[in-house]
Amino acid sequence: MRSEAVIAGSGAARDRLPATGVIGLCALIVVAEGYDLIMYGAMLPALLDETGWGMTKSTAGTVGSMVYVGMTAGALTGGRLADRFGRRRPLLVAVGWFTGWTAACGLAGSVAQLGAFRLLAGIGMGAAAAVALALAKEYTAPGRTSLTVTVLMAGIPIGGITSALAGLVLLSEHGWRPLCWIGAIGSALVLLIAIVLLPESREFARTRTPSRVRELFAAPRGPMTILFAVAAFAELLTWYGLNTWITTLMRELRYPMTSALQFSLTLNSGAVIGSFALAAAAVRWGARPVASVSACVAAAMIAACATGLSDRLLLLAVIAALGAAAHSTLNLINAAVADAYPADLRGSALGWSNGVGRLGAVAAPTLGGWVLAATGPLQVFQTFILTSVCAARVVGGRTPTGPPRPPAPGPRPPGGR
């Protein structure tokens, strides 16, 4: 009897959670994911010195890419499961999945084990991001999708900043393993809160209309579905390419800044702060036009970095603006996808665009390395300028869209005919 009362009480708590609470809880999930995703960069100096592992810079890059391979698979499958079984259950499973494998990373005994555990954790991360976006969208007031997506996706760099700070405190004295366990404990606490409070999507519960993935590619939505994925691929390649290579590129160009951490913190802080200003612009003018302009601004800031700025403050301002523009473009592409599809296709659409986009994240470290080795730093900057301009052109172009299917009729009001 007591367990039944607890279950009933938690269900009532979920029903009472306001829309802002649902969005905030989804954002908290993304912060936990961001920590677990980006902690690898903070761990890397200690991993390279790990006794008996023999990790090289080349194998470090391969292990670093494994999480994005997993995220590709997770986004593609998680979105589809969310459209079939609802948002709540797949999201809770995804968070539990990446929490467990993040804890396992702290127990890894070799480079191969760490790479395998990161890949498996990535599956949960990719699924969680796609489903959290779909759920939060369905608790968002009309016209506010861009702001909601920005709030959620700010969790990635916030989690990354948290992992960098944890690394500064713990790495020299305690090694890299505690960073994994801190991430797992934090994610587990978020999971417990979500189990108690996270509701099912109202829109999904109301409609529950059958959908098929093929509808994403059927006329007239097919071109839009493909172009959203191309835009996500190009911009994720730009963003993760910059995150991977900007410190090395600046050193190659002899920029007057010695702290790699300062580059990373400036880029990610700009991403968090600036993205809210661009989200407000998107509320007024629409996600796709602002995303296109934002990608063009990112390309211009990359070009500015490559020209040889000597003023320290100006350089920091350019890097912060670059972070804001590049990250905002990603947010607004997600907002445009969320707005463009009905509820029973939304999870699959977000999973598709994020899944294909993650292939850009997988390719970014390798592509940047190839271009740098074959040519030089200026050509790497030029490569990322081209990918950002490609994203601007694709997301800003006119594509046919299909009208959303009308929702399934709800229950008749009392006394209705």
Q: What residue ranges belong to the model's regions?
A:
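Helix-breaking motifs and short loop linkers at transmembrane-helix boundaries and internal kinks
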Residues: 52, 86, 107-113, 141, ...
